[in-house]
Design a protein with these regions (language model features):
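Cleavable N-terminal signal peptides of Sec/SRP-targeted secreted and luminal proteins
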Residues: 2-21
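Histidine- and aromatic-enriched segments that form or immediately flank copper-ligand environments
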Residues: 24-149, 222-251, 271-289, 362-524, ...
């Protein structure tokens, strides 16, 4: 323990001595509180008693120290979404992959440096479903250099989320949905309790001033369209990477993504609705409730009259089934990066990954009807027709790997291609029909893919009808990805490679794979460790749409993962974060299936 303490003191001393850098320290107390919405009191897990949780604000190069005190009845970890954690995979916050979970009545300290990143990221729980209420914004400001857009009058975090009127520990992934959508934790006046409207988010503005909206989609289930009546956005960054300024009246943002957008208060003084509406594929895809929310952008009183009685102007929203709005929004983004990142031209690894749903037989049955949601089978989410399943382990995979890379040789390799090539976007497979039953049966495994340090990796994600035509926001921990191209239908290497943007593609940590379409990304495996790659739709994640990307140590000390400074206080035999399997849906808890 003395060695750990000395190491920690040395770590802090080194941070303080860094030129101009600061140590930003927070304490997160995770607890269960009761909140009342829609005439119902619900137990909710939150940080420091608030929803959303506290904002973390840093300057590029600063060090962050967060003490997590878990007073909730559930195990917990915190993931710093989009923070690259260079040479610091230990702080990534994935239970049983990078650390043991933080047990109730136990503590853990995260420490990391935010380097070579600027913009908006966020933090959230990385245990199933609880990121719905355990989340907050992480703001990174530039330390030096010429600003790439005018300095705003004010910065405003806008966190789009969901309100669940049930205890998330008991959510049924086949039939339970959120009760409302939220902006900064508020449901808004589209919802009421016995006729009394729910409180909505209010954004006060001054005429002529410019505001920087730091937008986060913290929702579990849906991509959202965001509009403000009578105003336009100028998008300047996505996932903490600058983009060429893009003017639009609507923002499409998928779960896990962040967008920085400027808004000028240049309309007539008054009140204007800010609407966040979830989108979803049209029928025959399964239809979930459409639950938009709205806040109000209100001009300050400049003429001596009250504006509170003004009827807010409403924006004209697209059809919630019009997913092409999202396709065009993401397709219009190009990078504008001060560090002049170059897209690597050489390729060391190329993968084609299909995203779908499948099923396995229950109770060790040798055969059952594929796609059957009855008691015969369990529905899974898959990558190349394999669903992630990690058996019980006694320590984190990262610790086992660090001690000896051969300790994780039992992990099954994620294949380069699906086991069977077919018309991936065949509409007759929505929902799973007779054709799907003739495809390769789904399997379960602890999926991983190893990369040498410095490998350039290209991945094409292909959406399939077996996903019931859902889009999929795919998030890679520890790395950013160049988004080279996206398209509708099936990917065709001979034709589609010619469409790649190798000059100024957007750079993201979470890329949306369009419904019944594909997206091609490229990244450099230059951060040693074991990194999660997964869908950020929560139910797809818990059902197994996960793989581990293992980046091997480089040839030098500066390209190899160092040892961790602090051990997690907890017991390895209590690594299951929740208990139960409901209605044929199997839930993968980050790394353990129960």
């Amino acid at each position: 323990m003395a060695v750990v303490a000395i190491a920690f003191v040395f770590f802090l001393s080194a941070m303080v001595l860094s030129v101009h850098a600061a140590v930003v320290e927070h304490t997160f107390i995770v607890s269960q509180v009761n909140m009342t919405h829609l005439c119902k009191e619900t137990p909710v897990i939150v940080v420091n008693g608030q929803l959303p949780g506290p904002a973390i604000e840093v300057t590029e190069g600063d060090s962050v120290v967060v003490h997590v005190i878990n007073k909730s009845p559930y195990n917990m970890t915190i993931h710093w979404h989009g923070v690259k954690q260079q040479l610091n995979c230990w702080a990534d916050g994935v239970p049983m992959v990078t650390q043991l979970p933080i047990l109730p009545n136990h503590n853990f300290t995260y420490q990391f440096v935010v380097s070579e990143q600027e913009g908006t990221l966020w933090w959230h729980a990385h245990v199933p479903l609880y990121r719905a209420t355990v989340h907050g914004v992480l703001i990174i400001r530039a330390r030096q250099g010429v600003p790439l857009f005018p300095k705003p009058h004010k910065e405003v975090p806008i966190i789009i989320g969901e309100w669940w009127g049930i205890q998330l520990a008991y959510a049924d992934t086949t039939s339970d949905y959120n009760s409302a959508s939220t902006i900064n934790g508020k449901l808004g006046d589209l919802y009421n309790c016995s006729g009394a409207m729910e409180e909505g988010y209010m954004m006060d503005v001054e005429p002529g001033k410019t505001y920087l909206l730091r937008i986060v989609n913290a929702a579990l289930l849906s991509e959202y369209y965001l509009k403000i009546a009578g105003h336009k956005f100028t998008v300047v960054a996505a996932d903490a990477n600058y983009v060429s300024p893009y003017t639009t009246d609507i923002i499409a943002i998928a779960p896990g993504q962040t967008v920085d957008a400027l808004v000028v208060a240049n309309a007539a003084p008054g009140r204007y609705y800010m609407v966040a509406m979830p989108n979803q594929p049209p029928k025959p895809d399964f239809q979930s409730p459409v639950l938009p929310t709205r806040g109000i952008m209100q001009y300050s009183n400049t003429e001596g009259r009250s504006l509170s009685s003004d009827v807010p102007m409403s924006p004209e929203m697209p059809d919630n089934h019009d997913t092409m709005v999202s396709f065009y929004f993401h397709g219009n983004l190009t990078s504008l990066h001060p560090r002049h990142l170059l897209v690597p031209e050489r390729l060391d690894e190329r993968m084609f990954i299909t995203l779908g749903l499948g099923s396995v037989c229950k109770h060790d049955r040798l055969s059952c009807k594929r796609g059957d949601g009855s008691n015969e089978s369990t529905i899974l989410a898959t990558m190349n027709n394999v669903s992630f399943h990690l058996p019980p382990v006694s320590t984190s995979l990262l610790e086992a790997y660090y001690n000896n890379p051969s300790n994780v040789d039992w992990l099954q390799e994620l294949p380069d291609m699906p086991p069977q090539v077919f018309d991936f976007t065949d509409h007759s497979l929505i929902p799973t029909g007779p054709k799907a039953e003739r495809l390769e049966p789904t399997s379960k495994a602890a999926l991983a893919r190893r990369f040498r340090y410095g490998d350039v990796v290209e991945v094409v994600f292909q959406s399939t009808s077996l996903m019931q035509s859902d889009s999929n926001p795919m998030h890679l921990h520890g790395h950013d990805m160049f988004v080279l191209a996206q398209g509708q239908g099936n990917y065709d290497m001979e034709k589609d490679v010619a469409r790649y943007n190798l000059v100024n593609p957007p750079v993201v940590n979470t890329v949306l794979v369009p419904r019944l379409g594909w997206v091609a990304v490229r990244f450099v495996a230059d951060n040693p460790g074991i990194w999660y790659m997964h869908c950020h739709y929560e139910f797809h994640l818990t059902m197994g749409m996960v793989a581990l990307f293992i980046v091997e140590h480089g040839p030098t000390v500066n390209t190899s993962l160092p040892s961790r400074l602090l051990d997690l206080i907890g017991t390895a035999n209590d690594h299951f974060l929740m208990h139960g399997q409901k209605n044929g849906i199997e839930r993968t808890l980050g790394c353990a299936v129960i």
